[in-house]
Amino acid sequence: IITLGVMIFGVFGSQKSFDQLDSLPKDTESVRSFELLREGFSPGRLSPTNIFIENENIDLFDPKVVENFETLAKDILSTNLVDDVSYYVRPFGSYSDIGSSTILQSHKRNDSQLKPLFERSAQFISNDKNVVKFEVVLNVNPYSNEALDFIPNLRDVVNQSIESSSISESITYIGGETAEAFDTRKSGDRDTYLVL
């Protein structure tokens, strides 16, 4: 019984890692490239977190809807672990000099000079225009426990911002590798207690 108790304690006391690079030798090219990325850029660029907002009853180009999405982006950006947010009216990130009015013009006018802006912006809108994607870059390793622990907070921020807006009937989803790792960890923790 004592041996079994020690083994169970070891299961609960162990630190799980969801960073696949932890299992590789430190001198491999993929590990080194991530280290270079982390040194020169925000570590979250390796694997951005995606937020999908689904709503069949809104016009994405309505100024009020755009304002609601801009507020959502500011709310997300105000959290302590977020470095940048990109979405259809800010497809180059929140700090880009290209304003939302220029991006919206690219959707309205067939202008060859605006085509690259339109194409970049369109990557954040589903073909049927019912789903908008926000790309969130964290300022920490997206596979770290700190990043995984942040996912419920991010979900709360998104839901509160949406609920207090004119697009409150929208359905939100948080995706990407960090959110997937959080859900996997949560399921694994629950299953461990059930098994033991």
Task: List the predicted regions and their residue ranges.
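Signature of alpha-helical transmembrane segments and their immediate interfacial
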Residues: 1-19, 32
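Structured non-transmembrane domains adjacent to transmembrane bundles in polytopic membrane proteins
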Residues: 18-196
